[in-house]
Regions:
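N-terminal secretory signal peptides that target proteins for export/translocation
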Residues: 1-5
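Generic serine detector
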Residues: 7, 23-26, 156
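Bacterial N-terminal signal peptides
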Residues: 7-18
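N-terminal capping segments
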Residues: 20-120, 124
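Aromatic- and glycine-rich peptidoglycan recognition patches
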Residues: 122-137, 142-204
Length: 204
């Protein structure tokens, strides 16, 4: 991103913030921040989970677990349950990337492409091709990492000294709050407002 465009994005965030201010985004970011120092291991191993409300031990996880735990702790939304119910209702709407013919409640919600699909289906997608948009606390961003790896994180309410929003994520060192918003090519931007949150809760 060129410097002028980056500055414009940050200005838009400042101007738009009051319209989206409220307890909901702050609860989400706080729940993600609470994971820093607790989740200290990146562990992508497949695990059999309880259902609903299943999780691997809190000291470990992957990038999606930051989002899953934040929505569960901050908003009472169980993405394990939501993804399972939505995939059962329309399995063909979800990416066919893993050779599966039915849902797997242990892993479906822990895959970035599935979360991207879910967020788009509930109307949370913020288009990437319509010019600069603000990045607000609680927004969810996806990226493509080197090696064609998918990544996901949550926009923090904290900024760098230059004014860039920090990102809450787990990229290999446990949950961290870091300046990586513009570090990798973005593949998705999602904002879960009240309407989208209601749709998620209705799927539980």
């Amino acid at each position: 991103m060129i410097p002028d465009m980056r500055s414009l994005v940050l200005l838009l965030a400042v101007l738009a913030a009051p319209a989206f201010a409220g307890s909901e985004p702050s609860r989400l970011t706080a729940a993600a921040q609470d994971q820093v120092g607790v989740t200290v291991i990146y562990d992508p191993a497949y695990a059999k989970l309880a259902f609903p409300g299943g999780d691997v031990p809190r000291d470990r996880g992957v990038c999606t677990d930051v989002v899953i735990r934040a929505l569960r702790d901050g908003w009472g939304i169980d993405l394990q349950l939501v993804v399972n119910h939505d995939m059962k209702a329309d399995f063909a709407a979800y990416p066919a990337l893993w050779g599966l013919t039915k849902t797997d409640r242990n892993i479906d919600h822990r895959r970035v492409p599935n979360l991207q699909t879910l967020f788009a289906r509930i109307g949370a997608e913020v288009p990437l091709d319509e010019g600069p948009v603000p990045y607000l606390p609680g927004d969810i961003i996806t990226w493509k990492l080197p090696g064609n790896l998918d990544h996901i994180g949550i926009v923090s309410d904290r900024l760098t000294v230059e004014g860039t929003p920090l990102i809450l994520h787990n990229i290999g060192r446990g949950a961290q709050e870091e300046d990586i918003l513009f570090a990798y090519p973005m593949t998705g931007h999602y904002r879960i407002g009240k309407d989208q949150a209601k749709r998620l809760k209705a799927l539980q």
